[in-house]
């Protein structure tokens, strides 16, 4: 599972998810990509579930690049605890993904296999997404 090795601050502000992604909108490493069309937080468990779904379908063929990393911590108070008395304990890690960001890339497989692998992976993610190809240079 993806987690940062060390962080400066354990608890972070939630922040805002306005606008489009600044970078990472094109397929840069592989031939095909899965691009987010909505913005959302994606947890490290969701990233791992999507990766497993893709690699199992491809049967060890091709290469997968994960272009997002869960560097932001999120907190939660225990169930039944009243409001107040500080921020909750760190619960997990998320990758804030804005619309337009290419989250995963694949190379070394046919387009049909890549489409199906991304379709299976997209069911594991909380964002709407679309299949994109690398643009000819």
From Swiss-Prot:
Q: Report the protein name in the record.
A: Large ribosomal subunit protein uL16
rRNA-binding as a keyword?
yes
Q: Which GO terms describe its biological process?
A: translation
> Is Cell membrane a UniProt keyword of this protein?
no
Q: What's one GO-annotated cellular component?
A: cytosolic large ribosomal subunit
Quote the subunit structure annotation: Part of the 50S ribosomal subunit.
Q: Name one GO molecular function term.
A: rRNA binding
The similarity comment for this entry is:
Belongs to the universal ribosomal protein uL16 family.
Q: Which UniProt keywords are given for this protein, alphabetically ordered? A: Ribonucleoprotein, Ribosomal protein, RNA-binding, rRNA-binding, tRNA-binding
Signal peptide start and end residues:
none
| Cited PROSITE patterns | RIBOSOMAL_L16_1 (PS00586), RIBOSOMAL_L16_2 (PS00701)
Q: Which Pfam families match?
A: Ribosomal_L16
């Amino acid at each position: 599972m993806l987690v940062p090795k060390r962080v400066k601050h354990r608890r972070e502000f939630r922040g805002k998810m306005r606008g489009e992604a600044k970078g990472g909108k094109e397929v840069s490493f592989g031939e095909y990509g899965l691009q987010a069309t909505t913005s959302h937080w994606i947890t490290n468990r969701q990233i791992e579930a999507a990766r497993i779904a893709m690699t199992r379908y491809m049967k060890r063929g091709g290469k997968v690049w994960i272009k997002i990393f869960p560097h932001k911590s999120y907190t939660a108070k225990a169930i039944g605890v009243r409001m107040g008395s500080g921020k909750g304990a760190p619960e997990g890690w998320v990758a804030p993904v804005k619309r337009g960001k290419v989250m995963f890339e694949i190379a070394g497989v046919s387009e049909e296999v890549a489409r199906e692998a991304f379709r299976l992976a997209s069911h594991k993610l909380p964002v709407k997404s679309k299949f994109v190809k690398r643009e000819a240079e």
